[in-house]
């Protein structure tokens, strides 16, 4: 696997994409969308950030977020979200064996300027 370099810039805006494992349409189920919002609320208590925009599609989601200047590491935020979502997904369904919901890693893009911001908002 290639090594990815993530750029953590305090107070920056970041466009993030997380995709489900094998692009399974997890978010076609309204119960999973509720779980998405509940997980997000819990994670935001530990990793506060501003949600500038979002979209939830059947097999992935996009966030445009801004982190506080003292917490620029969004990898911890994404790890926590994906982990908590998976744990609660299993708990709700009383699943004890391993379940893979997410693709490894995630895609991120640090917003460079106003034009870049508008391009990602329009996406």
Name these PLM-found stretches.
Residues 1-123:
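Short catalytic/metal-binding and nucleic-acid-binding patches
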